[in-house]
Every structure is written in C-alpha cells, then in structure tokens.
C-alpha cells in the first residue's frame, strides 16, 4: 500500500514533469495557414478540410484557414502571414488578384524565410503576378505562354530539359492512376520513398511552364500525350523561403492517396523548417499498387 506521504511526492514529481515537458511538446507544433476561397474546383471546401486534417493528424502542425471572398477582389483579405511557419494555397484558376498590400506582404514573408506550399490548381492562379510565378516555378493556364518561361520536363534518357518552344502552358488528360518516379531520392521530402509508386486517380498536369528559377524537380510522371516525364513534385528557393509545389490533388479521391498525403505533409514540414521527420507510412503505395485512406470529407 502506497503511503499518503509517498503518493504526495509522486504526484508532485509528475506535476513537475508535465510542467517541463508539455510546453516543449507544444512548441514542436508548427503554425500553418491554408488560404482559399476562389478555385475552379468545386470541391475546394472539402480539400481544404482534408489538408487541414492531414497536417494536424501528423502531430507536427496547428492549422488556421483564411478564406477570400467567393467572387471578385476582396480588400479585407489580409492574412497575417508572419504568424505562420508555412502557408498552403488552395486557390485555383481564375482567382481574383489579392490586394496590392497583401501581395507585397506575401512576397516579403516568403523572401524572408517563410514556407509556401502550392497544391494542384494553385499553379493556375495569378499568371500576371511576377513574384508568385517565381515562387511556384511552373504554372499553367491563365494565358501562360513561352513569354512566361520554358517548359520543364525529363526526357526518356533521364535528362532535365528546359524547352523554350512556343506554346500554351498547362494541359491535362482524363483522370486516371499514374506512376510517380522519384528523381532525387536523397531530398528530405522523398527520402525513404520507393523509387516508383502508383498515385491514385488524378489529373496528370502537363506542359507547365514558368520562370523555373532555383527549382529542383523531385519527382515526375510519364504523360502519354506529351511523351514527356512531367514534374509532379518541385522545390523552389525564393529568397530565404522554401517552396514545395505539387500539381497533384485534383479530386477528393486524389487527395486520399497515401502518396499525396505523405508528400504534402512532408513538403509542408520541409518548407517550414528545411527538415523532415514525418515517416513514410507502412501503407505507402508501391510500384504496382495504389493506396488510399477514405476521409470523412
């Protein structure tokens, strides 16, 4: 039987331990911000909540969401970017320009070392915003042409090509599963992943083009239409800021792919810190088989 005196000492010790440990554990959580509100994909409210859940479930992030007005410009859209370690964009094609003050604040935030993640149609947004296109490296649609920058892809013989040929930026075929090929297995985002793995049903973006400055292609997917290996994961250095860009993630089912979930969360952590400790899960897809987790949406 434990004496009252011993029990009191034990409880006191536990209290000291919790006092010491809890703040440290809380400090490990990074603050993330998802911005959304205008997207040509009608499921954007669901994908915002899915991505929020993925980040929070990793136990690495706390997440806030700031939503732009649904139509036209929104003078009140002024997120406090500096309060966050990473910003995730779930905007899409045709999104109205942000207020000039907000654009400048975002540029300063990323240039000064803030993290940024561009998901799927976020690379359709803001074709006239020079700094934004430098951040995402490559974009599509919105009138992007050879004036926007080169096409970037891998050839069959494994060479990275910067193609300045004339033509529009951005295209995709019917949705289907497709294979992802890792091009840099040593990068913190891709380290430990299979050399090739199957991504679930999605749009395979092709013919993206843009400044492609300070950009590394981490992974590609072969596009039968272009006969090129199109970028599916990219990192871009913008000033002191780190950017992770994935064109994947069209539909809810696309974002339920364990490959998408893992690369998205790892990409966000890398953008925020430059390091990754989120593990590659046991149910990660293989070269032969996709793997998905049904979400509540």
What would you call each of these model-derived segments?
Residues 56, 62-64, 72, 153-239:
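Catalytic beta-strand/loop cores that center a nucleophilic Ser/Cys/Thr
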């Amino acid at each position: 039987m434990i004496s009252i005196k011993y029990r009191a000492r034990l409880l006191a010790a536990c209290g000291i331990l919790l006092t010491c440990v809890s703040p440290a554990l809380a400090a490990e959580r990074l603050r993330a911000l998802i911005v959304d509100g205008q997207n040509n994909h009608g499921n954007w409210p669901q994908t915002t909540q899915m991505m929020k859940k993925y980040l929070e479930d990793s136990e690495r992030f706390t997440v806030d969401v700031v939503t732009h007005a649904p139509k036209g410009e929104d003078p009140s859209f002024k997120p406090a970017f500096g309060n966050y370690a990473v910003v995730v964009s779930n905007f899409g094609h045709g999104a109205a320009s942000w207020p000039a003050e907000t654009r400048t604040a975002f540029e300063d935030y990323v240039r000064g070392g803030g993290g940024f993640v561009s998901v799927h149609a976020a690379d359709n947004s803001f074709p006239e915003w020079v700094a934004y296109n430098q951040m995402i490296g490559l974009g599509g649609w919105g009138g992007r042409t050879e004036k926007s920058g080169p096409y970037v892809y891998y050839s069959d013989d494994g060479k990275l090509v910067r193609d300045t040929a004339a033509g529009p930026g951005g295209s995709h075929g019917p949705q289907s599963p497709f294979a992802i090929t890792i091009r840099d297995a040593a990068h913190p985002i891709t380290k430990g992943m299979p050399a090739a793995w199957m991504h679930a049903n999605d749009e395979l973006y092709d013919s993206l083009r843009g400044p492609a400055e300070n950009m590394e292609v981490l992974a590609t997917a072969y596009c039968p239409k272009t006969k090129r290996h199109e970028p599916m994961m990219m990192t871009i250095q913008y000033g002191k800021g780190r950017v992770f860009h994935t064109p994947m993630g069209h539909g809810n089912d696309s974002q339920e792919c364990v490959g998408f979930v893992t690369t998205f969360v790892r990409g966000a952590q890398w953008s925020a810190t430059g390091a990754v400790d989120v593990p590659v899960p046991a149910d990660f897809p293989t070269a032969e088989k996709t793997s998905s987790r049904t979400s509540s949406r």
